[in-house]
Regions:
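Glycine-rich phosphate-binding loop signature in dinucleotide/nucleotide-binding domains
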Residues: 73-81
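Glycine-rich, highly charged phosphate/nucleotide-binding loops
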Residues: 60-70
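Mixed-charge interfacial surface used for oligomerization/domain docking
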Residues: 3, 9-17, 22-28, 89, ...
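A short, ordered amphipathic alpha-helix with a cationic face
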Residues: 36, 114-117
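N-terminal glycine-rich anion-binding loop in soluble enzyme alpha/beta folds
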Residues: 3-61
């Protein structure tokens, strides 16, 4: 059977992956010296914690063993596994998965570097499920997903400058001036999977319009 595996940067809630039969590897979040496995709290709870924290949370990639446990079970069940993971330029998650694959004598594990994050990974996974259900084999699905990722562009509007200040990218004064001026930074993921600046806009409405251009 063809199955899909994502990490928790995929924008899927834990309950959603369980319902759809998607395997999910969590990322560890460290906030205020407390380690939380992504999925143990909801997105809203996480955003509330970040908003109330003085510093931004830190994340750590899953270990090779986390993937190895899943890969060995796939081999045991003779499942074909398609892994769609967070951009290799943003995390070492893909490196951990690749190392784990090298430790399993099994050629039915396929690892895709999404070169993206969040909802893009979810879109790719949902499309992969559609292809599987239409009768495509794993290699055909991987080929289609590799083509798909080059056609998707991820943009985001930063609604507040507070997190840039917490992360040390802006001073308190700069953040204050930017907030008063209603500056909204536009960020994107480049073709090679890195975070890049698209520009700045005045006001949320203008920022969203600039993304569409």
């Amino acid at each position: 059977m063809i199955k899909f595996l994502v990490d928790s940067a995929s924008d899927y809630e834990k309950t959603e992956t369980e319902k759809k039969g998607i395997l999910r590897i969590p990322i560890t979040i460290t906030l205020k010296d407390k380690n939380i496995l992504d999925g143990e709290i909801t997105k809203d709870e996480f955003y509330q914690l970040v908003q109330n924290a003085d510093e931004l949370p830190k994340t750590s990639q899953p270990s090779p063993q986390d993937f190895l446990d899943v890969f060995e079970k796939a081999k045991e069940n003779d499942d074909e596994l398609i892994c769609i993971l967070l951009s290799s330029k943003l995390s070492g998650t893909l490196q951990s998965a690749t190392l784990a694959k090298s430790m399993v004598d099994y050629d039915k594990i396929h690892i895709i570097d999404s070169l993206s994050a969040t909802y893009v990974i979810k879109m790719m996974t949902e499309y992969g499920i559609q292809l599987r259900d239409s009768g495509k084999n794993a290699l055909e699905i991987v080929d289609e997903l590799e083509k798909m990722k080059s056609k998707i562009k991820l943009y985001a509007v930063l609604d507040t400058l507070e997190n840039l200040k917490k992360g040390g990218r802006l001073s308190t004064v700069e953040a204050g001036i930017g907030t008063l001026a209603k500056i909204k930074p536009l960020v994107t993921l480049t073709e090679d999977g890195k975070v890049g600046m698209k520009g700045k806009s005045i006001g949320r409405k203008k920022a969203l319009a600039d993304i569409v251009k």
